[in-house]
C-alpha cells in the first residue's frame, strides 16, 4: 500500500512538472526530439568493416602482398570483389595502385604458385581522398568499392572458374585495408581464408604434399585476418546514407592515426585532419568505438551536439527575449532553416564547435545581463566559469573558435563595467543617504553616528564589491586561460604521434617539443587545408554567406538524368529574411543611439532587451564570419556557427516589431493574431515550401535532373558546377 502511494505521488509530481511548462516549451521539446529522431534515422547505416589490415611494402617500390584461399562451396565462380580501403599514407590527391590476381592450386611438384599472366581481375588506381590526376577513384577512402565485376553480360564476360581458388592482393603503398569481400555468381559471399590453418582445413587432404601452397600462406601477415572479420558489412548505394563524404575521410583518417600510434614507414605521408583541433577526433572516436567505422558510428556524436545546439538555441532565445514563444521560433528556424540538417549530421567538427561557442555566449550573456548577486556571489559568478570552460572545449575542437569567441570577451568586459558602475551607484546611494540623514540630524552626536554607520556600510560594500570582482576575474582567468591550456594539451596527447609524423622532418628522430608540435597543429586550424575534389569549386569568400552567394557540394553522384548530391546551403527564404532582419535591427540600433539613447525617441521599456540581443547576435555574426574571412578555401559548409547568429536576427526583428505593434488582434483560424504575427505565419509557410523543395539535396536522395533544377537549383546565385547541372 505504501509503495503504491509513493508511486502515485511520483506520477502526480511528474504531471505537475509537465503542466508547469508552457505550450511553447513543450513544442520546443518536440522540435528537438524530432530533429534528433530524423537525424538518427538518416545519418547512415550501422554496417561497419571490422579491424583494419595495415599493408606495408617491404621496400620502397615494392608491394605488400596477401594471399586468400577461396572455398567455393556452391560450385559458383568468383564474380565480384568488394574492397574497403581506409587511410592511404600518401599525399592527399596522389594515386596508389591495388592489384588482385588469381591462380589455381599448385601441383605437388610445383615450387611456386603460377599467378595468371592474363589477370582478368587486374588493377585499380585509388586517389587518396581524391585523385588530382583524374586517373584514380575519387572519394574511395572508407567507402566500399566494387573492385571487380567479372560476370558481365554487356562485356560478355563470365565469372572466374572455381578452379582458381587462390587470390593475391597487392598494395603499392602503406595503407589500411578495412575489408575484402568475395562474391560468387549467385550473389553469395565466398568464404575466404588467409591463415594456413584455416586454408588447410578448408582445402582438406593433400595440402602437405603441395609445399608452394603452404609457403604462400606461411608468409601472410598475422593481421591479414582483419581483412575478413566483417564479411556482411558491404554498403551499396551512392548517397550519404551509405557513403562518407571526402571531408569525413579526414576525420576517420585522424581517428586511425590515433590508433596507429607511433608506427611509421619511411616514405609514407601521414596526413592529418588539419582543419580541426585534437578534441574533435577524440569525440568522434567515441561513436566509432561503439558502432565501428560506419556512417552512423562517425556521425552520431556530431548529431548529438547538433541536437543540443538546437535545444540551446531555444534556451538562449528564451533568455534573450524573455519569451518561450520567440525561443521556440529561434530553435525551429535554426533546426530547419540553417545547415544543421546537412553539415550538422556529418562526421565533422562544426556542430560540436558551434555548440560550445554558443554555450560560452549563453553563460557570458547571463553574467553581462545580471551580474553577480550579493546574496549568492559564487553561484552567480559560475556563469563566467562555465562560459570559459565551454570556450576551452570549443578551442580544443577548433582553434578558430578564439576568433568567434572574441565576442564573449566583449560581453565579459561590458558585464564587468556594468558591475563596477552598479557598485559605484550603490556607494553614491549610501553617501546620499548619509548626507540626507545628517541634514535632518538634531545634534552633532547623531551626525557622528550616521557617519560611522555610513563608513561601516561603505566598508562592507567595498569588501563585497572587491570579492565579487575577484570572483569574476579569477573565474575568467581559470577557465579562459588555464582550462583552455589544460583541455587543449590533454586532448592533444592522443594525437601527438600523428602530429610528429606530419610535422617532423624525420619522425624517427623528432626534434620538436610537444608545445611546438601542438602550436603547429593549432596554427594550421586557421586555414582550410583539408582539400577535396570539391574544394576549389565550393570556395567562396565568407562575406558571401550574407546573401547565400554560393552553396557547397559535399558529395555528388549525379549520373545521366539522375541528380544525387548533398549540398550545404541555408534555406533561401530564411537567408533573405535574416538579411532584412539584420539590416532592420542595425538601423534601429543606430537610430536609437543617434536620437539620444535611453532618452531619445526610439527608447521604450523593451529597448534594453532588444539592444542586448542585437549586441549578442552582431558580435557572434561578425566574429564567426571573420573566422573564415581570410581562408581561401572557405565555403558555405563552414558557415554553421555563422547561421546560428544570422538566423537569430529573424526572431529579434519580429520580437521588436511585435512588442511595438499597436494593431488590434484579429482571429485567424481561431488564433488571435496582430499584424506582426500574421506576417510571421505567412513567412513560415514560405519557409516550409522552400524546405520541402530543398529536401532532396538536404538528405541526399536521387531526383530527376530537371526536377532538381526547379526545386533547388535556383537557391544558389553562383553555381559551383555540382550544385545545379
Model-derived features: positions:
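Membrane-interface transmembrane helices that cradle and orient dolichyl/undecaprenyl
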Residues: 320, 360-384, 394, 416-423
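Transmembrane helical bundles and short interhelical boundary loops of multi-pass, membrane-embedded
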Residues: 2-31, 37-67, 237-239, 410, ...
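Transmembrane-helix motifs of polytopic, lipid-linked glycan transferases
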Residues: 296, 300-321, 359, 584
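Loop-to-helix entry region of an early transmembrane alpha helix in multi-pass inner-membrane enzymes
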Residues: 274-282, 291-308, 328, 343, ...
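Extracytosolic helix-loop segments that constitute the early lumenal/periplasmic catalytic or substrate-binding loops
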Residues: 220-272, 279, 523-525, 529
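Short acidic/glycine- and proline-prone juxtamembrane loop motifs at membrane-interface regions
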Residues: 339-352, 399-400
Amino acid at each position: 500500500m505504501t509503495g503504491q502511494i509513493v508511486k502515485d505521488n511520483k506520477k502526480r509530481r511528474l504531471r505537475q512538472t509537465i503542466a508547469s511548462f508552457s505550450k511553447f516549451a513543450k513544442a520546443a521539446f518536440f522540435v528537438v526530439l524530432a530533429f534528433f529522431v530524423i537525424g538518427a534515422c538518416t545519418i547512415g547505416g550501422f554496417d561497419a568493416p571490422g579491424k583494419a589490415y595495415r599493408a606495408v611494402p617491404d621496400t620502397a617500390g615494392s608491394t605488400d602482398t596477401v594471399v586468400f584461399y577461396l572455398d567455393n562451396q556452391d560450385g559458383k565462380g568468383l564474380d565480384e570483389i568488394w574492397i574497403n580501403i581506409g587511410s592511404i599514407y600518401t599525399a592527399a590527391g596522389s594515386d596508389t595502385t591495388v592489384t588482385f590476381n588469381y591462380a589455381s592450386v599448385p601441383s605437388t611438384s610445383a615450387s611456386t604458385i603460377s599467378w595468371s599472366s592474363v589477370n582478368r581481375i587486374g588493377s585499380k588506381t585509388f586517389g587518396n581522398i581524391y585523385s588530382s590526376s583524374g586517373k584514380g577513384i575519387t572519394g574511395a577512402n572508407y567507402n566500399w568499392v566494387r573492385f571487380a565485376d567479372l560476370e558481365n553480360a554487356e562485356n560478355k564476360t563470365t565469372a572466374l572458374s572455381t578452379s582458381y581458388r587462390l587470390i593475391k592482393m597487392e598494395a603499392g603503398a602503406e595503407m589500411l585495408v578495412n575489408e575484402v569481400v568475395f562474391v560468387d555468381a549467385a550473389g553469395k559471399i565466398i568464404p575466404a581464408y588467409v591463415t594456413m590453418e584455416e586454408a588447410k582445413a578448408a582445402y582438406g587432404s593433400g595440402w602437405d604434399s603441395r609445399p608452394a601452397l603452404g609457403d604462400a600462406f606461411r608468409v601472410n601477415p598475422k593481421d591479414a585476418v582483419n581483412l575478413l572479420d566483417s564479411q556482411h558489412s558491404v554498403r551499396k548505394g551512392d548517397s550519404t546514407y551509405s557513403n562518407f563524404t571526402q571531408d569525413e575521410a579526414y576525420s576517420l583518417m585522424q581517428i586511425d592515426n590515433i590508433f596507429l600510434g607511433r608506427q611509421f614507414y619511411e616514405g609514407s605521408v601521414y596526413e592529418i585532419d588539419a582543419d580541426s583541433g585534437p578534441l574533435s577526433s577524440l569525440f568522434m572516436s567515441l561513436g566509432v568505438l561503439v558502432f565501428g567505422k560506419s556512417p552512423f558510428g562517425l556521425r552520431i556524436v556530431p548529431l548529438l551536439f547538433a541536437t543540443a545546439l538546437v535545444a540551446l538555441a531555444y534556451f538562449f532565445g528564451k533568455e534573450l527575449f524573455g519569451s518561450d514563444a520567440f525561443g521556440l521560433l529561434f530553435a525551429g528556424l535554426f533546426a530547419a532553416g540553417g545547415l544543421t540538417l546537412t553539415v550538422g549530421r556529418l562526421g565533422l567538427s562544426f556542430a560540436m564547435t558551434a555548440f560550445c561557442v554558443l554555450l560560452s555566449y549563453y553563460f557570458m550573456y547571463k553574467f553581462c545581463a545580471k551580474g553577480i548577486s550579493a546574496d549568492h556571489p559564487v553561484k552567480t559568478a559560475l556563469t563566467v566559469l562555465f562560459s570559459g570552460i565551454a570556450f576551452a572545449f570549443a578551442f580544443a575542437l577548433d582553434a578558430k573558435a578564439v576568433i568567434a569567441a572574441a565576442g564573449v570577451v566583449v560581453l565579459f568586459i561590458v558585464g564587468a563595467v556594468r558591475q563596477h558602475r552598479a557598485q559605484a551607484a550603490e556607494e553614491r546611494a549610501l553617501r546620499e543617504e548619509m548626507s540626507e540623514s545628517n541634514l535632518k540630524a538634531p545634534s552633532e552626536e547623531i551626525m557622528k553616528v550616521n557617519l560611522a554607520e555610513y563608513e561601516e556600510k561603505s566598508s562592507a560594500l567595498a569588501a563585497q564589491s572587491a570579492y565579487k570582482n575577484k570572483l569574476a576575474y579569477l573565474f575568467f582567468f581559470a577557465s579562459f586561460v588555464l582550462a583552455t591550456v589544460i583541455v587543449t594539451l590533454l586532448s592533444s596527447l592522443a594525437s601527438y604521434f600523428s602530429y610528429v609524423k606530419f610535422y617532423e622532418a624525420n619522425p624517427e628522430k623528432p626534434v620538436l617539443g610537444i608545445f611546438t608540435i601542438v602550436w603547429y597543429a593549432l596554427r594550421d586550424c586557421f586555414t582550410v587545408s583539408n582539400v577535396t575534389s570539391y574544394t576549389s569549386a565550393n570556395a567562396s569568400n565568407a562575406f558571401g554567406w550574407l546573401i547565400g552567394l554560393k552553396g557547397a557540394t559535399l558529395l555528388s553522384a549525379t549520373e545521366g538524368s539522375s541528380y544525387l548530391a548533398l549540398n550545404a546551403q541555408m534555406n533561401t527564404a530564411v537567408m533573405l529574411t535574416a538579411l532584412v532582419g539584420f539590416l532592420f535591427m542595425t538601423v534601429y540600433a543606430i537610430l536609437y543611439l543617434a536620437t539620444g539613447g535611453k532618452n531619445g525617441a526610439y527608447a521604450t521599456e523593451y529597448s534594453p532587451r532588444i539592444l542586448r540581443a542585437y549586441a549578442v547576435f552582431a558580435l557572434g555574426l561578425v566574429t564567426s564570419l571573420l573566422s573564415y574571412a581570410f581562408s581561401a578555401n572557405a565555403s558555405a559548409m563552414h558557415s554553421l556557427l555563422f547561421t546560428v547568429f544570422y538566423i537569430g536576427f529573424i526572431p529579434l526583428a519580429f520580437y521588436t516589431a511585435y512588442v511595438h505593434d499597436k494593431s488590434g488582434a484579429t482571429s485567424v483560424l481561431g488564433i488571435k493574431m496582430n499584424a506582426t504575427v500574421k506576417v510571421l505565419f505567412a513567412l513560415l509557410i514560405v519557409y516550409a515550401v522552400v524546405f520541402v523543395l530543398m529536401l532532396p539535396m538536404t538528405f541526399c536522395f536521387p531526383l530527376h535532373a530537371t526536377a532538381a533544377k526547379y526545386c533547388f537549383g535556383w537557391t544558389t546565385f553562383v553555381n559551383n558546377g555540382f550544385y545545379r547541372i
